[in-house]
């Protein structure tokens, strides 16, 4: 294969050892990937921050957040992305603010105008909010920061989810995925470090305590850390229970929908706030099925519950139960009610649905007597709805009914609305009431409540102006509202629609829904608006159906998650949008009707296999031969493209191995070399018959691959022992006995010539050639024993007796020639060529012992009376030549550490095979032997001369 990589392995030789395959098991671990996410308790984007001011001018808070220009408030998410951290258990996250859509500021102006027509003056008096005795005061009232929620140090680890397809009921076209019924898991959501803190706060110098000034931009913040047990599932619930004097939100009432978001705007849990019980119940989404180890901390904006915490400068017990954890803290509350003011108003609350302003005005708290009282309301950017009958006038009969929180118990007030004529003008933007109602004078006190609805035609955020025109002074109070990025208003109830449909298994992969194809349960579906903000999420039911409800006209985005083990089918196949697949992400438009055409199809991802064979390559040719067998128990490891181990196995008794359930992609196969074996040659022939090496890279593309093989052969052992023993024994014994007796009376001429020639030549030649070339195990023992024994015994006995009276001529010639030739030649050549390791020790011992013994005994007796001439010539030549030649050549080529002895030995020894025992002599004693022989001959010659002389004398 082109994707294979040849790897060179080490070689080694271990002689005479049993090769064993050492197999180790390998376990695959699952790494948990830590994903840091930031969770936020949001207030569903329907709440506004509001500030109330009494100085007649608009003060814009720098801490206010932005809002889109739509009816509903939109929560903004910090654009910081989550940072994954695979090294630590948690990941630090940036603070994320879930802001409500509009930051509203209310500005109130109080102006007194004297009735003197000749000097009409307008004065504005301001004083510190802590001052209660000024007739005209500037106040800073409520700032709604209900959605200013920050999350810190939140982490979550993704879960692995397996989704199985279920049978689809194709008849249930309009059925909706039923919400999963979970259990209360207050005991599985754990809170710690709970605190209720005053954001900003105002220090009372008299008491030294920090107070919560509800109408001066202060808010309360509920803070806590939390962890969620991994056993929590989609549909499980937990609760936030607020106490008697404490609630979520701010001037704007908390929305019924209070969702829990992470930093990217994904919904973790959907909350429903019940104002009756002052409790929020959160239901977990499928987010908790996708992630483990979810933990974090949060801050949630909260407010004093005005209807219960009614009195300024009073400490109230702010209590909350988060899950099963309870916390309380006493907070001093001040609303800034100035009882000396003839006209003062406040925003009682802002409705979280239609953003209407529910106003409360206190008229004549000082109980002054007037002969003229005209109450006028002018709206800018708002309108009254006369048909709603929500302009109420209550007569105060008890001074205590002017509660500081501007939330009087109207059930205890006297409703006198019908006694007055309310005149609407200026397109319902102005309302006028004559509070004298025909009386000449009056000191009556009133509480007037109104509802102002946003005017969609307004280009600004509007304001509400009040005037109380009396016979003494004209008082004015103005309430203005502004947001940072535009108004978010609504007028009337819009019709809601549904969006969704179906996720199915496209078994034939044609991208179309067929009658026999079933739905897939458990697919995550996310709904987003046109700006990419997540609005909702759900999970397909057992029939593959899903549905989002309560949607207005507009453009939406739907995202489908890919179920485990599936692949998205072809998108937009054919022309029928109702039966095709719209892909993983699609856009749906709602235009005065439900849109139930957003489908997605998936087919089961094909799985492939990989593997083949590990064999014993006995002939080391790198090819699989029919006679070669597989190797059992070889460990094979499979890695993915990232180098992560995804499987291990061992070859079976036939050398086969296999990995299954693999996706198309890049892999690496690693063979663990068995102990005692050597990697054979790689890529020597066709891909399905060769060896691919110890590590092989392979790419699977829509097919199986059974060509990944590897071969090994056993390491060789060579034992070569060459022993050459050459024994040459040469024994040369030359015995010459010459007896010459000459008796001459007159003239005797005796010539005795004794020539003894002993020549011993011992040549021992032993040629042992041992050549061992073995690939596996060769034991060659070459033993050459050459024994050459030469025993030459020459015995010459010459007896010459001459008796002559006159002339005797005796000639004795003795010639003894002993020739012994022993040739011993030892040539040991040991040549070992091995792939392993051969250590050849060549020891050549050549011992040549030649013993040549020449014994010449000459007895000459000469008796001559007259003249004797004796010439005795004895020539004895003993030549011993012993040549021993031992040549040992050992050639060893090896890579490993094993030893092979080779001992050629050539030995030449002296052995005697005659009965006579001669002294042991070496070749270096030849000169000594010759001297002895010549000495004997000279002695014989002397005897003859003496004998001849004596005969002459006798003569």
UniProtKB/Swiss-Prot annotation:
Among PROSITE patterns, the record links this protein to:
GRAM_POS_ANCHORING (PS50847)
Which regions are flagged for Polar residues bias? 56-71, 84-114, 133-164
**GO biological processes:** cell adhesion
Motif, LPXTG sorting signal: chain positions: 918-922
Keywords, ordered alphabetically: Calcium, Cell wall, Peptidoglycan-anchor, Repeat, Secreted, Signal
Q: Which InterPro entries match?
A: Adhesin_Fg-bd_dom_2, Adhesion_dom_sf, Fibrogen-bd_dom1, Ig-like_fold, LPXTG_anchor, SDr-like, Sdr_B, SDR_Ig
> How is it placed in the membrane, per its record?
Peptidoglycan-anchor
* Listed Low complexity bias regions: 115-132, 920-935
Does the record's keyword annotation contain Electron transport?
no
Q: Which Pfam families match?
A: Big_8 (PF17961), Gram_pos_anchor (PF00746), SdrD_B (PF17210), SdrG_C_C (PF10425), YSIRK_signal (PF04650)
Give me the stretches of Basic and acidic residues compositional bias.
72-83
Q: Name one GO cellular component term.
A: extracellular region
* Bias (Acidic residues): 685-695, 712-894
How does this chain assemble? Homodimerizes; via N2-Domain. Interacts with host NRXN1; this interaction mediates bacterial attachment to host cells.
PANTHER family given in the database record: TOL-PAL SYSTEM PROTEIN TOLA (PTHR34403:SF8)
Q: What is the name of the protein in this document?
A: Serine-aspartate repeat-containing protein C
The species this protein belongs to is Staphylococcus aureus (strain MW2)
Where is the organism placed in the taxonomic lineage, from the top?
A: Bacteria, Bacillati, Bacillota, Bacilli, Bacillales
């Amino acid at each position: 294969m082109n994707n294979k990589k040849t790897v060179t392995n080490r070689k080694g030789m271990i002689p005479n050892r049993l090769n064993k395959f050492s197999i180790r098991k390998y376990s695959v671990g699952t790494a948990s990937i830590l994903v840091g996410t930031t969770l936020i308790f949001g207030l569903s984007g329907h709440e506004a921050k509001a500030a109330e001011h009494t100085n007649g001018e608009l003060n814009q808070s720098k801490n206010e957040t932005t809002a889109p220009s739509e009816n509903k408030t939109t929560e903004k998410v910090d654009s910081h992305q989550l940072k994954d951290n695979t090294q630590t258990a948690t990941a630090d996250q940036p603070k994320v603010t879930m802001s409500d859509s509009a930051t509203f500021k209310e500005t109130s102006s109080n102006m007194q105008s004297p009735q003197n027509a000749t000097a009409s003056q307008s004065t504005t008096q301001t004083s510190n909010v802590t001052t209660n005795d000024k007739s005209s005061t500037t106040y800073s009232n409520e700032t709604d920061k209900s959605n200013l929620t920050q999350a810190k140090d939140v982490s979550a680890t993704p879960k692995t989810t397996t989704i199985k397809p279920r049978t689809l009921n194709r008849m249930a076209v309009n059925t909706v995925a039923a919400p999963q019924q979970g259990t209360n898991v207050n005991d599985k959501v754990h809170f710690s470090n709970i605190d209720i803190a005053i954001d900003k706060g105002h220090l009372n110098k008299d008491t030294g305590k920090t107070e919560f000034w509800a109408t001066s931009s202060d808010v309360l913040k509920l803070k806590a850390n939390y962890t969620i047990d991994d056993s929590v599932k989609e549909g499980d619930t937990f609760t936030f229970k607020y106490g008697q004097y404490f609630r979520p939100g701010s001037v704007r009432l908390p929305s019924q929908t209070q969702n829990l978001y992470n930093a990217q705007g994904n919904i973790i849990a959907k909350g429903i706030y019940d104002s009756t019980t002052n409790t929020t119940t959160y239901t977990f989404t499928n987010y908790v099925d996708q992630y483990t180890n979810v933990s974090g901390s949060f801050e949630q904006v909260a407010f004093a519950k005005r209807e219960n915490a009614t009195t300024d400068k009073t400490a109230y017990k702010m209590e909350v139960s988060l899950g099963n954890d309870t916390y309380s803290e006493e907070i001093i509350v001040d609303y800034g009610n100035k009882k000396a003011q003839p006209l003062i108003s406040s925003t009682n609350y802002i409705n979280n649905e239609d953003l209407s302003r529910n106003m409360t005005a206190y008229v004549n708290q000082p109980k002054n007597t007037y002969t003229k009282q005209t109450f006028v309301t002018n709206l800018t950017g708002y309108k009254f709805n006369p048909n709603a009958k929500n302009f109420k006038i209550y007569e105060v009969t008890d001074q205590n009914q002017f509660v500081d929180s501007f939330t009087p118990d109207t059930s205890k007030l006297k409703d006198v609305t019908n006694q007055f004529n309310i005149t609407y003008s200026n397109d319902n933007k102005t309302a006028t009431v004559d509070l004298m109602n025909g009386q000449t004078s009056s000191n009556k006190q009133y509480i007037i409540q109104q509802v102002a609805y946003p005017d969609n035609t307004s280009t600004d955020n509007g304001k509400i102006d009040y005037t109380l025109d009396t016979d003494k002074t004209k008082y004015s109070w103005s309430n203005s509202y502004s947001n940072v990025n535009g108004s978010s208003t609504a007028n009337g109830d819009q019709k809601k629609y549904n969006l969704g449909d179906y996720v199915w298994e496209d078994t034939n992969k044609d991208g179309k829904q067929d009658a026999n194809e079933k739905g897939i349960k458990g697919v995550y579906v996310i709904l987003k608006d046109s700006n990419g903000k997540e609005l909702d999420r759900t999970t397909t039911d057992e029939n593959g159906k899903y549905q989002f409800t309560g949607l207005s006209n507009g453009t939406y985005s739907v995202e489908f998650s890919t179920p485990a083990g599936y692949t998205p089918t072809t998108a937009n196949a054919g022309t029928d949008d109702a039966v095709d697949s719209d892909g993983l992400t699609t856009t749906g438009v709602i235009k005065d009707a439900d849109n139930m055409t957003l489908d997605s199809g998936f087919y089961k991802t094909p799985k492939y296999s990989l593997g083949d064979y590990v064999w014993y390559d006995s002939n080391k040719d790198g090819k699989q031969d029919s006679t070669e067998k597989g190797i059992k128990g070889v460990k094979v490891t499979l890695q993915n493209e990232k180098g992560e181990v995804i499987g291990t196995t061992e070859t079976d008794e036939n050398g086969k191995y296999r990995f299954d359930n693999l996706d198309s992609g890049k892999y690496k196969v690693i063979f663990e070399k068995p102990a005692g074996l050597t990697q054979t040659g790689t890529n020597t022939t066709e891909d399905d018959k060769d060896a691919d090496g110890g590590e092989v890279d392979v790419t699977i593309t829509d097919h199986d691959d059974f060509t990944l093989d590897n071969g090994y052969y056993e390491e060789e052992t060579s034992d070569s022992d060459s022993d050459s023993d050459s024994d040459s024994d040469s024994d040369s014994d030359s015995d010459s006995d010459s007896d010459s007796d000459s008796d001459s009376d007159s003239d005797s001429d005796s010539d005795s010539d004794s020539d003894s020639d002993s020549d011993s030549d011992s040549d021992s030649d032993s040629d042992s050639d041992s050549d061992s070339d073995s690939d596996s195990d060769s034991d060659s023992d070459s033993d050459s024993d050459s024994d050459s024994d030469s025993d030459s015994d020459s015995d010459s006995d010459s007896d010459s007796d001459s008796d002559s009276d006159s002339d005797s001529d005796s000639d004795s010639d003795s010639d003894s020639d002993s020739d012994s030739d022993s040739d011993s030649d030892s040539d040991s050549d040991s040549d070992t060529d091995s792939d392993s390791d051969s250590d050849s020790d060549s020891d050549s011992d050549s011992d040549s012992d030649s013993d040549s013994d020449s014994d010449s005994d000459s007895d000459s007796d000469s008796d001559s009376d007259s003249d004797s001439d004796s010439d005795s010539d004895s020539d004895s030549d003993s030549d011993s030549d012993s040549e021993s030649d031992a040549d040992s050549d050992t050639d060893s080529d090896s890579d490993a550490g094993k030893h092979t002895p080779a001992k050629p030995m050539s030995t030449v020894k002296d052995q005697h095979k005659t009965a006579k025992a001669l002294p042991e002599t070496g070749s270096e004693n030849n000169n000594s032997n010759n001297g002895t022989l010549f000495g004997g001959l000279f002695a014989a010659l002397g005897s003859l001369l003496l004998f001849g002389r004596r005969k002459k004398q006798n003569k």
